[in-house]
Amino acid sequence: MGNSANEDKLRYACDRCHSQKLRCPRSVEPEKANPEEPCSRCRKAGVPCVVSLRGKVGRPSKATKKKSARSPRATSTPEAEFPPYDINSVLSGEVDGSIPWASPSGDRMMDMFDLASGSGSVTTSASPKTMAEDYQPEGQRPFPDPLMGPGLIQVPYEPFLMEFDTDADYPTFCIPPSLTDMPAGVEFNQPQDKTFNSSQMDSFMDVKTDASMMMPHADMDMTSPKGTGPTIDPVTVDPRMSFSAHAAQSPGDIFASDDFEAGAEFSSTASYQKLSDLNLRILQCGSTAQAGTAPQNSSQLLKDVVGFSGELIDIARQSMPHFVGCTRSSSRASTTSKGSSMESDEGDGSIDTAFSQSSWGSLKPGSASGPQATSQSVPESAVIFLLLGCYTQILHLFELTTNCLWAQHCEAGQPAPQNDDTSGTIGSLLEASIAIHTVTYLLSRLHRALAAPEMDASTDAADSHGWKKSFVGGKELEDGLLGRAFGEIREREQWLMRRTKHLQQRINKCHI
């Protein structure tokens, strides 16, 4: 019994054959082989044939080694429980419900079950592979995890965050690029390299439309004193019209202030050419407006009138101080000397009494530079009458504008209703109100431009006839061409102011 117990503990192969993994002759017929006799290989080699105890000498048994190595993987990721689905079949709805139990991983699990059952004998299989040769570590597997599936492996991986150009200059959106670059006292939402430019905002606010012309308010003083008058920005005039030399400046500069260069040289020839061109364009505009006086033409006509008035005001502010013989700065000082010269020339009945200190004195006989200075220039009287002619034609355009508004908002040929209120829209009433204020404002500015420099411009525009003293010398000329021309102009002004006042009252009664 004791020998049988010891023999059971011995290995069937000798140590030399076991280390070389050769089939030992002792294992062929272990019951016949004597443990004391050496095997044929050890006998030929002339070495002692040593047989060690089973499990005590050499490496541990295969079953124990494989069980310890496979147990963590078997508990963490059971590969045989989930079939490797194809991603294409999943998307198309054709999923195979069969589980491949005949996979290599399933065979390995069955072998582990047989070894763990403790049969005590090595089961021989037809496959030459052993469990140790079939097993490979997880990091060295040539095939991916079966859970991913073969179809999912072929799908390219596209990350959500694509590659960005980090060197590109992107806007900071009011966030400074580096907090260390910010000086002390600067808030976080204020970028250091950004500055506010008011001119950029002006380009967005300056919208030129028919109903959005920048005109003075209704309760604004139309004839405020010098330097404090309201300023407007006239709209763009018709592009088919040609402008004179002042067109290079912005149109708002014409109405901005009453200041001008006192030392600017006056040329009657240049002024006559400007007035002649302006007179021709006003005549063409009036002919076009009379051909079709439709209500929708009032906005375009008003644009043209604004441009014409600006040019006439510019020319008048350059020529009137030269005609009167004084500037804005010296107007008060020349009042007394002008009055004495007017009394001395009153008996002669000369028309030059109003211009005693002007350049008209150079035209008198005996003047040192009279004939030589005026031989190559246009007479200044022609410039004066052209000023009046252009002003009269602009009054005519004012009349056409108010007639268009009257035809649009009032009943033609019928008196204005006393109790019944008319109706209108916001756009039409706003356009009409802006047009009325534009006409009255331009009329007051023309009066101030044509008035003598020393006269006070604080009177009302409807009753302002003091500008005529620059042309008639303070005396009302009832006879003659000039007196009749002034009478006609006065009638036009009075009719225009009555019509605009009546039209404003009608618009105020309208309800939306």
Swiss-Prot record:
Q: Which Gene3D superfamilies match?
A: Zn(2)-C6 fungal-type DNA-binding domain (4.10.240.10)
Q: Which residues bind DNA?
A: 14-49
Which residue ranges does the record annotate as region Disordered? 54-87, 118-148, 325-351
Q: Which UniProt keywords apply?
A: DNA-binding, Metal-binding, Nucleus, Transcription, Transcription regulation, Zinc
Listed GO CC annotations: nucleus
What the record says about the induction of its expression is:
Expression is induced on AF medium.
Compartments (UniProt record): Nucleus
| Comp. bias intervals (Basic residues) | 56-70
- Its recorded name reads Ascofuranone/ascochlorin biosynthesis clusters transcription regulator
Identify the species of origin: Acremonium egyptiacum (Oospora egyptiaca)
Point out the gene that encodes the protein: ascR
